[in-house]
Amino acid sequence: MTLVDRFLKYVSFDTQSDESTGLTPSTPKQMVFAEYLKTELESLGLEDITLDEHGYLFATLPANIDKKVPTIGFIAHMDTSPDMTGKDVTPRIVKGYDGTDIVLCAEENIILSPAQFPELLDHKGEDLIVTNGKTLLGADDKAGIAEIVSAIVYLKEHPEIKHGKIRIGFNPDEEIGEGAHKFDVGKFGCEWAYTMDGGEVGELEFENFNAAAAKITFKGRNVHPGYAKNKMINSIRVANQFIAMLPSTETPEQTEGYEGFYHLISIQGDVEQSTVSYIIRDHDRAKFEKRKEEIKRLVAQVNTEYGEGTATLELRDQYYNMREKIEPVMHIIDTAFAAMEAVGVKPNVKPIRGGTDGAQLSFKGLPCPNIFAGGLNFHGRYEFVPIQNMEKAMNVIVKIAELVASK
C-alpha cells in the first residue's frame, strides 16, 4: 500500500470528535479507526502493539543497530474537527495542478480558488488531494498518520538505513483539546517525540499559545417591559456591555504572529440570564496572566455597577507554551532542522497560533515539538493536501530516525 493509498483509506473513516460527551475517546467511531490501525500495524510486523480502552494506540519498530541510541517517537491524532462533518469523505486527486480554480461541487458552486486561497499557487504542478465540497478532508491529521506508518514501512524495507528504537503513537480527541489527557508518557517510553500535525512544508514549531477558557454568566431581573423603568436588568444588555469593554482590536481576525487575543466563541441568553464564552490566548506567559486578570477586573466592574452576583466567572487554564520545556533540549529541534535540510526542505520555525498534543505532552515530561504534515485549510470543505507535501514529511521522519542513530 502506497502513502497515498494509505491516506485515502484512512479518510474513509469518520472520526469526528465531540467535546460534549465527556468520554475518552469522545466518540466510539474513533475506536473503530484505532482497531483498523492496530490490525494494520500487526500485519506490518511491528512489536509491543497496545490499544487501551481510551483509544491510545502505541507500537514499536525495534532498533536495527547494536549501539545504544535514544528512543524517539512520532505521534499523530486520529480524530477530525467537530467544525465540519467527516462522514462520507470523497477525496479527488487533481493531478498537475495548473493554478486555476478547482470546482469542488458544481451543483452548489463550491470552488477552491487561488483568489481566496493564494497558497494554492505555491503548489502549481503538484498533485492535490481535495474534497467534494461537502465534508472536510481529514488531512488534519490522517496525513500525519499515513506519513508515520509509511515511514516505518520504508525503514523496515530498507535495513541499510540504521535507526534506534522508534515508538509510534496515535491518539484520540486532539481537536477538542484532550488528546494528551490520558496519554501514558511512561508507557510510551521515549526520550522525546514529534507530533506530525503541522501544515505547510517546512513548518517546525516549538512555541504555542498559553490558553485559557472563560465563561461569564450574567443574571438579570425580568419585569413587564411596560413597567420596567428602574426595575428591569436585561442580562443580554449587560453581557453586551461586558463584550464592549474588551479591546476590539485584540481578536483573532485582527492579530497575527505573537499577538494574543480574546476570542468570543459563543453567546446565549434571554432577559433573565445570559452566558458568554471566551478563549484567551497569548504566547507570552506574563501577558497571558494579565489577560486573565483583565477578565476578572471587568467582571468585578459589572458587579460594582449592577450588584454583587450579577456576573459570575468560570476561568480555567487549558494548556501552556511548550517553549520552556523545549529550550533545555534544543538538540531535538536541531535534529529536525537538519533532517529537513537533508531532504531538500527549507525549515520554517514559527510559533503555533494554537495548541498541539505535543504542548501538553511536553509538560508531562515528553518534549514534543511539531512538524508539518502538509495539509492546508484544515477544518473545512476547502481543506487540501499536496501529495508531494506528504512525501516530504515521510522523508523527514526517515531522516530524523537516521540522524539520531548516527550520533
Swiss-Prot record:
This is Peptidase T. The keyword Metal-binding applies. Its cofactor is Zn(2+). Its main location: cytoplasm. Zn(2+) 1 binds at residues 77, 140, 197. Binds 2 Zn(2+) ions per subunit. It comes from Bacteroides thetaiotaomicron (strain ATCC 29148 / DSM 2079 / JCM 5827 / CCUG 10774 / NCTC 10582 / VPI-5482 / E50). The keyword Metal-binding applies. Zn(2+) 2 binds at residues 140, 175, 379. The gene is pepT. It catalyses: Release of the N-terminal residue from a tripeptide. NCBIfam families: peptidase-T, PRK05469.1, PRK13381.1. InterPro entries: ArgE/DapE_CS (IPR001261), Bact_exopeptidase_dim_dom (IPR036264), Peptidase_M20 (IPR002933), Peptidase_M20_dimer (IPR011650), Peptidase_M20B (IPR010161).
